[in-house]
């Protein structure tokens, strides 16, 4: 769970951009995202990347002044989502906001990256697919064994 001190510490450590949970989940102490963001803006000048799970949370994040949106939390909250990567959500958000949309979550094939850019993504974040050598090797072995 993220709180204001986390954001301030990250900024002091040199972070210029901090990702924040921009869903409707309650923060520590029962704080809403809007209240959390107001507090962040009072205590920090860091650029905020809103990690969202839905079009609604993306629209709210933009209206509250977040500088960019990432689809990081699609499929990780109570809101139903298709299998990752959620290209449909990327397209919905990109068509409705004026800030950069970073496609994140489930990108492991070049075609899905291409699809994300075609859907309007400003950038694509690839994580586990390249940072987890065990998973990467397992995927190659699975493909080899199916050949």
Feature names for model-found ranges:
Residues 1-6, 22-41, 55-60, 77-94, ...:
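Active-site-adjacent beta->alpha loops and helix N-cap segments on the catalytic face
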Residues 2-10, 53-65, 97-103, 107-126:
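Catalytic cores of alpha/beta
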Residues 19-20, 49, 70, 125:
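Conserved beta-strand positions in the central sheet of alpha/beta enzyme cores
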Residues 45-46, 99:
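A short helix->loop->beta-strand "cap" motif at the edges of active sites that frequently abuts
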């Amino acid at each position: 769970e993220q709180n204001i001190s986390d954001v301030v510490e990250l900024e002091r450590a040199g972070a210029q951009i901090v990702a924040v949970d921009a869903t409707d989940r309650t923060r520590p102490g029962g704080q809403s995202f809007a209240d959390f963001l107001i507090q962040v803006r009072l205590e920090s000048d860091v650029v905020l990347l809103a990690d969202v799970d839905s079009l609604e949370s993306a629209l709210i994040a933009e209206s509250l002044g977040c500088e960019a949106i990432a689809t990081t939390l699609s499929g990780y909250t109570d809101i139903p989502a298709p299998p990752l990567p959620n290209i449909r959500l990327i397209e919905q958000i990109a068509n409705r906001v004026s800030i950069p949309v970073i496609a994140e979550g489930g990108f492991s094939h070049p075609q899905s990256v291409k699809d994300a850019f075609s859907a309007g993504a400003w950038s694509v974040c690839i994580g586990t697919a390249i940072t987890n050598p065990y998973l990467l090797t397992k995927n190659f072995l699975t493909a080899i064994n199916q050949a």
